[in-house]
């Protein structure tokens, strides 16, 4: 199937500091493209992959699972590590969960983690019944475009494929057990009013990780897709400030320096 316009992956070759940006479940790179673009404009090397099964039609996602989504971000991380001296991982929603697993699995190869409204549990969708219901009903109503800003719209599926939702639930349960392995500096930004991932997920993540350098920011004016909402600029600036604080490869003037 052809890609939906706007769902294309994004790559920018900048300096020696790399950033991997991960989009969310049933979404597309469009939801985090301004975030990635801001970091690219500041001179960083940025990779924003399209997750398998996304960006076309929801039926294509039925044929994929968490192993496919994680393999893609793991591959993208590997490419950044070959190109850059330092790499940060970022993500929205499920993308945040994928970023946290990359941090847990790759240790010092990941310099820091930035997550926005990260998922820790599948809520609703009859989550506990998914193992059975997914064989009876292929999909249910979508979760895209939870945005407070008038006119804000996320490019995502209008249906949630239940086989994929079941796989996502299994992934989050596994990740919860791995969160203590996350030791890197962490910037977690979340919306008090989120109709997809409730704030309790962020609280759980903060309680489970082993990171000592932790910064929490509230996104008071935004819903779930905060990267397209009123607090988008705050997210972009906080992310760059976090990376600048931790990386010797980012110059004071804002441009990422190259060796």
Range-by-range predicted roles:
Residues 221-259:
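Catalytic active-site module of serine/aspartate enzymes centered on a nucleophile-bearing elbow/loop
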Residues 91-95, 99:
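Gly/Ala-rich beta-loop-alpha elbow adjacent to hydrolase catalytic centers
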Residues 182, 188-190, 194:
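Short beta-strand/loop motif that positions the catalytic acidic residue
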Residues 35, 184, 198-207:
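Short alpha-helix in the alpha/beta-hydrolase fold that links the catalytic acid
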Residues 47, 203, 207-225:
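Catalytic histidine neighborhood in serine/cysteine hydrolases
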Residues 2-57:
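Short, surface-exposed "cap/lid" segments of acyl-processing enzymes
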Residues 114-124:
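Active-site nucleophile loop of the alpha/beta-hydrolase fold
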Residues 57-84, 88:
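Catalytic nucleophile-loop/oxyanion-hole region of alpha/beta-hydrolase
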């Amino acid at each position: 199937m052809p890609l939906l316009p706007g769902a294309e992956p994004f790559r920018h070759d900048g300096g020696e500091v790399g950033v991997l940006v991960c989009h969310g479940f049933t979404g597309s790179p469009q939801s985090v493209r301004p975030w990635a673009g801001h970091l690219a404009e500041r001179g960083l090397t940025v990779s924003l992959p399209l997750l398998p099964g996304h960006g076309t039609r929801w039926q294509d996602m039925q044929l994929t699972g968490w192993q496919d989504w994680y393999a893609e971000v793991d591959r993208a991380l590997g490419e950044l590590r070959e190109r850059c001296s330092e790499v940060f991982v970022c993500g929205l929603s499920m993308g945040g969960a994928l970023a946290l697993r990359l941090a847990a699995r790759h240790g010092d190869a990941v310099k820091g983690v930035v997550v926005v409204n990260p998922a820790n549990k599948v809520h609703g969708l009859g989550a506990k019944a998914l193992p059975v219901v997914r064989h009876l009903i292929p999909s249910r109503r979508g979760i895209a475009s939870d945005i407070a800003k008038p006119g804000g719209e996320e490019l995502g599926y209008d249906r949630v494929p239940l086989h994929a939702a079941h796989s996502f639930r299994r992934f989050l349960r596994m990740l919860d057990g791995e969160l203590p392995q996350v030791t890197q500096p962490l910037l977690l930004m979340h919306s008090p009013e989120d109709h997809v991932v409730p704030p309790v997920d962020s609280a759980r993540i903060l309680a489970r990780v082993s990171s000592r350098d932790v910064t929490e920011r509230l996104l008071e004016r935004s819903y779930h897709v905060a990267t397209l909402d009123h607090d988008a600029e705050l997210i972009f600036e906080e992310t760059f400030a976090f990376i600048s604080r931790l990386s010797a490869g980012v110059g004071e003037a804002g441009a990422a320096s190259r060796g």
